[in-house]
Design a protein with these regions (language model features):
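Cap/lid segment of the alpha/beta-hydrolase catalytic domain
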Residues: 341-364, 376-463
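Secretory targeting signatures
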Residues: 1-32
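Short regulatory "switch" loops immediately downstream of catalytic or recognition motifs
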Residues: 1, 24, 150-156, 338-341, ...
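Acidic, low-complexity Ser/Thr/Gly/Pro-rich repeat segments typical of extracellular/periplasmic
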Residues: 67-344
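Extracellular calcium-associated, cysteine-rich motifs in secreted modular proteins
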Residues: 26-67
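A conserved hydrophobic secondary-structure block that centers on an alpha-helix together
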Residues: 193-220, 224-225, 359-401
Length: 463
């Protein structure tokens, strides 16, 4: 028994020792990880996060305030050239209407929106599709601008002293920016200006400008009739003097104006002396002639070498009773037509690309005068194609050339030059004062007249 008791005591001691190793104290637990943003500068900072999960979101930095422009322009428009505050399209030709276009020969395309074109008293103006098709300004363009007061031009080159415009101190300059050539010109003000309007100051060239060429214009050291110096517009002064403006258009042109000022400086012009200056680019030959060349080629193919035909409606022997005319012949000939109507105002039919489109053949009047001397001498004579004056007609020119025809032994032939003829064009031009868009339709009639003359010559040389 005693041994059993000792055995039990020994077992209890061992068990108690083992239990003391397991229960002698609590084991520490690893802390729970809390992922989140731990950056106090972040918008989504989590103060309870113990592990960064890279989820921090930071506020957008406050944009730097735009610097205050040096000049705030009172006259701004998305449709106008902001350089001149007096008129939307000034200075003219305005560089603001030249749009970059890599598909054209010049790299530009002219775009004058309808909102920029002066409205008549009868309605608003639309853009001119004929103008906006070309890749620059006309080489025959007018060049002019306005100032706050009218300059005294008495000391500048006029039409009798054009050579003075090339003097080193002359107040106006016209320079070819591609070649550096100074162009002779004269200066005049618009004598028809009204008291409540700024006066146009023109630079008149003595010849057409080069095609596809850049030009610069400069006015400097101008004074008014009282001898007071004339200030440039706020926009121009900002460009000249390097002052910033609140006009995106002005700022977008600044680099090009810097090039202009550099070119004028190379011609001896002090930058500070300028009161107005601008640049423009003329259209390419292909762009200017694209409509009429297409019409000519299309009409030539339709006409062939001998034309389509003619109808004689009247023959008068001995016309004029002055022994100068053997025979006067009147009639019509067939001509390819591209105008919607023979009667103005009418527009040219064009396809979706703006190219003139053939409509049909129509009959156009002609007059032929054969001088008496050819009949008397039994010989033929050269044929002379006549034009006519403003609002005239071909018949009047042919019948009025009897003496000249008989003296020279030439056969006279003529038709009306539509657009400036007595055949309804006076009324059409009157309508153009109401709707200026009609002016471009008159130009389209001119092109049709060229085709008419081509058809007339083909027809009668083929007889």
């Amino acid at each position: 028994m005693r041994n059993n008791a000792k055995t039990k005591i020994a077992i209890l001691l061992v068990i108690s020792m083992l239990l003391s190793g397991c229960t002698g104290g609590e084991t520490e637990q690893e802390p729970e990880e809390i992922p989140g943003c731990m950056d106090e500068a972040a918008e989504n900072y989590n103060p309870d996060a113990t592990v960064s999960d890279r989820s921090c979101i930071y506020p957008e930095p406050e944009p730097e305030p735009e610097p205050e422009p040096d000049v705030r322009l009172a006259s701004q428009s998305e449709f106008c050239d902001d350089v001149n505050p007096h008129h939307c399209m000034l200075p003219f030709p305005a560089p603001a209407f030249l749009v970059d276009d890599g598909t054209t020969a010049t790299g530009y395309r002219l775009h004058i929106p309808g909102e920029a074109i002066p409205d008549s008293g009868s309605g608003t103006s639309d853009e001119f599709h004929m103008i906006n098709r070309v890749d620059g300004y006309s080489p025959s363009t007018q060049i002019f601008t306005t100032f706050e007061s009218t300059p005294d031009v008495s000391g500048m080159a006029d039409q009798y002293s054009i050579g003075d415009s090339l003097d080193s101190g002359h107040s106006t300059l016209l320079i070819n920016l591609d070649t550096g050539e100074l162009l002779p010109h004269w200066v005049e003000v618009d004598m028809r200006s009204q008291d409540d309007e700024a006066t146009f100051v023109y630079i008149r060239t003595i010849r057409g400008l080069d095609h596809d060429a850049s030009y610069g214009v400069g006015y400097r050291n101008l004074v008014d009739s009282g001898g007071n110096s004339i200030e440039g517009s706020d926009a121009f002064v900002a460009l000249r003097d390097g002052l910033t403006t609140d006009s995106p258009q002005i700022e977008s042109q600044r680099a090009q104006y810097e090039g202009l000022f550099e070119a004028l400086g190379g011609a001896g012009v002090e930058r500070a002396s300028l009161q107005a200056a601008w640049f423009f680019h003329t259209a390419s030959t292909a762009s200017i002639l694209q409509d009429i060349v297409h019409m000519r080629d299309d009409a030539s193919q339709r006409l062939g070498d001998d034309g389509i035909g003619c109808n004689v409606t009247e023959v008068v022997d001995g016309y004029g009773d002055d022994n100068a005319t053997f025979r006067l012949i009147r009639g019509t000939f067939s001509t390819p037509q591209y105008m919607e109507s023979d009667y103005p105002p009418a527009e040219m039919r064009r396809d979706s690309s703006g190219t003139p489109e053939f409509i049909e053949f129509r009959e156009v009047v002609f007059t032929i005068l054969i001088p008496q001397i050819l009949a008397d001498e039994g010989r033929s004579g050269l044929m002379t194609v006549l034009g006519h004056g403003f609002m005239g007609d071909g018949d009047g020119m042919a019948t009025g050339s009897r003496e000249f025809a008989n003296l020279t032994g030439r056969v006279m032939i003529a038709t009306d030059w539509k657009g400036w003829s007595a055949d309804g064009d006076f009324d059409a031009l009157t309508y153009s004062l109401i709707n200026v868009e009609y002016f471009q339709h008159q130009h389209e009639r001119h092109m049709q007249s060229i085709v008419n003359n081509l058809a007339m010559i083909r027809t009668f040389t083929g007889v």
